[in-house]
Amino acid sequence: MRKYPFFYMNSFSCVPGYGNPAAVVYGAENISETDMQKIAKINGLSETAFIINEKTSGYDYRIKFFTPEKPINMCGHASIAAAYAYSEMNDMPCEISLTQKTDVGTLKIKVERLNEYSRASLQMDTPDIERTFHGQYKEFAQALGLKEEEIENDLPVAVNKKGYLYIPIKTIDSARRIKTNKELMLDMDKKLNLHGWYVFTPQVLLAENDFHVRFFAPSMGVDEDPVTGTANAYFSFYYYRYISAKPSGHLKNEQGFEIGKNGEIEVEFSELDA
């Protein structure tokens, strides 16, 4: 049986065991997608990334992502983990910029390997909002185990073009009391073509942060994701459209506290009005 280099990494935290874990398999050129899915299911993490080395001048490597249930086109925290693994396997400098090819295009990732921890950042486009819901919050609240009045009326519930649902709630107490109804969420996923539920409030646990976040993706086999890179990056467009009205800025969000995976993520956004 052939053996492959395997990495287990936590993104978005400097504390071991916190943040969002991802598995990375290096040199997966000869692993079939069927076997990739089996490996991801055995790992049981929200995502497993497979690095495929290809000789090309257009990018450094190709990557595929799998949840325990199905393949997905993109994953932020697993992209960061994969870039770090690639730099380690190829004995690259402590600071390096990489380009990875995904099923939805190429991503530019910067990796800084430091003594006590490492930093990584990736650049991506943010999808526009596709549709909004105003005052029609009963089913959303029921799916989260909340009362309808706990959802913020001054902001819309919105779905972007990638199928991410954004739900503003009033208080951090509501956020921490969420108890999802998985069956109802799955029904709404099918009805609205959703891929994930991003719930947020401006009330935070750590004063330096802007929003407290929780993210659920039951249709992807992820009951709750600890810290979600892609969803937080996409949130910047919602923030611009409905909260700040400024096309450039910075956000720092906290996530994962309810499941013991405390993490923080920073988002820089610009030219969202272009």
Where on the chain are the PLM-derived regions?
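Active-site proximal loop and beta-alpha junction motif in alpha/beta enzyme cores
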Residues: 1-74, 80-274
